[in-house]
Amino acid sequence: MSIAIVYSRAQVGIEAPAVTVEVHLSNGLPSLSIVGLPETAVKESKDRVRSAILNSRFEFPLRRITVNLAPADLPKEGGRFDLPIALGILAASGQINVQRLPAYEFFGELALTGELRPIRAVLPAALTARDHGRALVTPLANAAEAALVEDLEVLPAPHLLAVCAHLNDSDPLPRYRAERSDGTQPEAADMAEVKGQEHAKRAMEVAATGGHNLLMIGPPGTGKSMLAARLPGILPPMSEQEALETAAIASISGNDFDPASWRRRRFRAPHHTASAIALVGGGSDPRPGEISLAHNGVLFLDELPEFDRRVLETLREPLESGVVTISRAARQASFPARFQLVAAMNPCPCGHLGDGSDRCRCTAEQVQRYRRRVSGPFLDRIDLQIEVPALPRAELLNRQPPAEDSNAIRQRVIAARAIQLERAGKANAHINHKERDRHCRLADSEQRLLERAMQRLNLSARGLHRILKVARSIADLAASPDIDAEHLTEAISLRRLDIRKP
């Protein structure tokens, strides 16, 4: 047979669309051409494939070879198609058995020696391959990642020869079997290590319960960064679907993805000099940015006013929708971005306003200019806005009874989050307007209290709705079916900070 078909998959956003590798051998001058809108890296695979076939002691056909990567309108990039192209050439030239090819999907970059090198974005391809009932043949280094998908036969191969021997039934590839780590190793950072700041710790607990965004403002050294780093340790565990989605994004980014920690919530803390592309994602071949890498986890923005204002404004839509869409001239890609934002900032340019040291010499105009670097619409999307004051030296030096550890807080958060999932199927921060009206009803007295707070604090409609969601989370922590005045008052106190006023 002078034609062969091999199955593989491309990568577009978080999706893995099917790619059919068609190889045809015909009479004519010896040549190898690849068609089907391949990128430069795919075109370069011609030389890699030829050398790999020859160094694996197969014959490279001295015929006119046409390789079509279908569908033709789907951009293909990277060396992931090296293995299926090589197998297609060997099958079309009759050197390997073609009967078993339809049962598998193949991925892998070939070294000149025929060894298989790892590729990125294997996990999205593995998820889709399972749904289509095919086994997966991958490089050995990608096996643990692909094996995260249950009910999928993963066959890791170290070399092109091993794949060919498997297809010829002479030496079957062993199925990869690995214990699926739950990824729930104890967090090194414990909330008990933070001295004092009980009000801030309570805000962290409420934020973790409902998935709310949080802004902390206070002088340097008050524990803002410590508190933020401990938020993942009190968040409830991810579901299997959430964990796989998060792991798939890490797989696409290719930044040292560790299958052993696939269930751990991510904590991302980009520097304030990060560009919009670094934060949101982009590039000619769209890659996920920090907000997608923090999907189902925590995105910590320290020194918030130091970020470029235009960069911060790009976060407004993902904060609402939980998705970021990157559009380029040739393609469009969407990545999930349902992250929990935690931001921290100083109260003034020098940072010492209100710390009791009398070191601050900033004028009121300088303070206002500093705080106005963060726009009102962006602040409106942050549910909790609290002050983290400097602690008295005596409180820092005195021995105090052990503070509550992260595990104790986490158990309360898990119980409250279970109430939310049973009620609405999602965290309180993500409920829509209809669900909010249904689940956040107030009695007349609480309604009047909220109206007074709205007038006094000059709240927008979005700010009002976010207070209701926070109050619902506080009520869930108390296992209360109704929002009472105490819950509403605490929710208002967690948002009453006006960072515009020095």
Task: Label each PLM-derived region with a short phrase.
Residues M1-L215, P219-M226, S327, G463-L464, ...:
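Peripheral, non-AAA+ core regions of ATP-driven protein-machinery
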Residues F60-R63, R100-L101, D131, E150, ...:
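Short loop/turn elements that form and flank the Walker-type P-loop nucleotide-binding site
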Residues L112, L299-F300, E306-F307, R393:
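Residues immediately C-terminal
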Residues N168-V206, G210, M238-I291:
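P-loop NTPase nucleotide-binding/switch module
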Residues M216-D256, S321:
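Walker A/P-loop
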Residues N296, D302-E303, T314:
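Walker B catalytic acidic pair
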